[in-house]
Amino acid sequence: MPTLTDLSTIRDLCARYDFALSKGFGQNFIINPGICPRIAEAAGIGPGWGALEVGPGIGVLTEQLCKRADKVVSIEVDKRLPPLLEETMAGYDNFKLVLNDVLKVDLKALLAEEFGDKPVAVCANLPYYITSPILMRLLEEKLPIRNITVMVQKEAAQRLCAAPGTRDAGAISYAVAYYAEPKLLFSVQHGSFYPAPKVTSAVIRLDVRKTPAVQVPNGDEAAFFALIRAAFSQRRKTAANAIANGLHLPKAQVLTALQSAGLDERARPEQLTLEEYCALQNALHTK
């Protein structure tokens, strides 16, 4: 079997199948042979496990997953890739390709049908432009997955893994921390890809929590995250100003809620923890 990280192999495959990499799909193939084994190992996949992959490309990471998991299901939106994958994955009978959009496919039904009671890990080299929507769909639907190990743009990785209440945290950091325990594993230089992106990448692992990190008031997650998004919508302002503007509330009401929750009225959005946003949401809705 040809080495899928070899540039000549990639060019030969692309030429024979008349395949041109698509900027629209954010396609950058991995040519560093050491990266994908590290991703697969970091996911903790082994005998008895299932692996769900998003965007297999020509199968570089897929191959490493197939060597470790009982079954690998890869979701691919690019209709041009199945013929290439049929060739590159021909030696693995535990591989299945699903031609669909990961943001539209019924993931709960897919996981139940393909993996049953197996522990499942998600692995992917995610397109930069759609990282957050994919990760949030995987987390928000409370799917039966153990962890998510993905390669993303390093700047996004740092934001995704930033602890709530710290300077680097953004609204997405709070959402990730609510559903999972994130860890930034290692960086990947741009020369590890073909074509080489202009930015550095990084691999992160999200260990999915069995229950969310905090219990939001009335279980209203939509209102809880609307509050956090409003707070971060005007990051340079105080949380009070941003929330009042973002949720169209009187500033006096927000200040009263902050005081009632025992929080600093001058706090910046990133200075509040998940627990403190819960307390604030509760105070805002307590009459």
Please tell me what each predicted stretch does.
Residues 1-222, 226-230, 259, 270, ...:
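Catalytic cores of RNA-modifying enzymes
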Residues 208, 228-287:
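C-terminal lobe and adjacent flexible extensions of AdoMet/dcAdoMet transferase-like proteins
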